[in-house]
């Protein structure tokens, strides 16, 4: 039987048809090596973002770019706000970097207190994720700007992960820094095509930095041919799938709020969603993910994230009927108990 996977944040509409066709056409060229410099892909990305091809470095998924940045720049002491995606720390440790955690104050948001830590500590690398995974919380634009200016002053390089930023473009408190990267040459924005275009199995991520010496250094770190021929064809086609993009963003915006409202009615503590997932706490039900397995549902429990325990969960936004089934199963599990819990809170 097929699992309904709410644990992976992938666009529920699946791979765009134009991308599928592009990949099928590219199969005939598999006898050739891919372009090690990904010139066509970087040109397409540059046009899409209004940047220069030399400001872009591509990799085998966002995680590949993270590891290559760590190895290319060899930072000594990184500041990492947590909870956060585990690969930042794994990459930094592997490159011999000391990592200091900064615990985001509840409700797990970046606050001006991070400015003080950055000012006082002896750091040369800062990781920011906007909106954050798994919480979905954004960094207020004015605060983000202050952090980037302070980092410049302190000679701190910033990895700004915007992998979920596309999906938050309707949220006024989450703003992409890509148009302003020329002001911040010490910042690399991390992006991925796997989430919005459902290309998780192909792996395609990239970084954008206005300091071309940085992108060149990253490009020459790690293995050559880091983007295969099929992934490059898929990426180029995805960038021109404008109707698919519009439809997806509109759907995700409406559906995430519906899921937010319905989960809230079940008595869970909810976080405002800004991407294609919903983060919540089920204090009354710490083994919710295990209880959903007999229903064929995979849910992401967040106790593997630093600072979170087994009562925190992240659910991807799937198709309406699939989200409806998740809600139905949760009502079955909570039963009377869930209703009683709701009345008492």
Where are these predicted regions, by residue range?
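Short loop-beta-helix segment that forms the pyridoxal 5′-phosphate
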Residues: 34, 46-68, 81
């Amino acid at each position: 039987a097929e699992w309904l996977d709410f644990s992976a944040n992938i666009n529920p509409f699946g791979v765009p048809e134009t991308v599928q066709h592009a990949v099928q056409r590219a199969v005939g060229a598999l006898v050739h090596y891919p372009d090690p410099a990904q010139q066509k892909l970087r040109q397409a990305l540059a046009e899409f973002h209004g940047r220069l091809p030399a400001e872009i470095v591509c990799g085998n998924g966002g995680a590949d770019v993270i590891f290559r940045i760590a190895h290319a720049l060899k930072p000594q002491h990184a500041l990492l706000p947590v909870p956060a995606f585990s690969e930042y720390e794994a990459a930094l440790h592997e490159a011999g970097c000391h990592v200091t955690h900064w615990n985001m104050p509840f409700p797990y948001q970046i606050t001006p207190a991070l400015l003080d830590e950055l000012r006082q500590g002896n750091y040369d690398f800062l990781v920011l994720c906007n909106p954050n995974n798994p919480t979905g919380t954004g960094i207020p634009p004015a605060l983000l700007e202050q952090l980037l200016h302070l980092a410049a002053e302190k000679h701190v390089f910033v990895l700004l992960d915007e992998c979920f930023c596309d999906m938050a473009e309707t949220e006024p408190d989450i703003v992409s820094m890509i148009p302003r990267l020329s002001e911040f040459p010490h910042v690399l924005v991390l992006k991925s095509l796997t989430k919005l275009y459902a290309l998780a199995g192909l792996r395609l991520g990239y970084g954008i930095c206005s300091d071309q010496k940085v992108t060149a250094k990253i490009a020459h770190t790690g293995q050559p041919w880091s983007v295969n021929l099929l992934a490059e064809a898929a990426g180029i086609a995805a960038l021109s799938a404008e109707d698919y993009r519009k439809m997806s963003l509109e759907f995700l915006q409406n559906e995430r709020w519906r899921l937010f409202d319905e989960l809230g009615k079940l008595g869970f503590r909810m976080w405002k969603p800004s991407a294609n997932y919903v983060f919540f706490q089920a204090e009354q039900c710490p083994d919710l993910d295990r209880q959903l397995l007999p229903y064929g549902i995979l849910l992401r429990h967040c106790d593997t994230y630093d600072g979170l325990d087994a009562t925190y969960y992240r659910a991807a936004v799937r198709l309406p009927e699939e989200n409806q089934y998740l809600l139905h199963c949760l009502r079955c599990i909570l039963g009377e108990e869930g209703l009683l819990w709701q009345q008492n809170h």
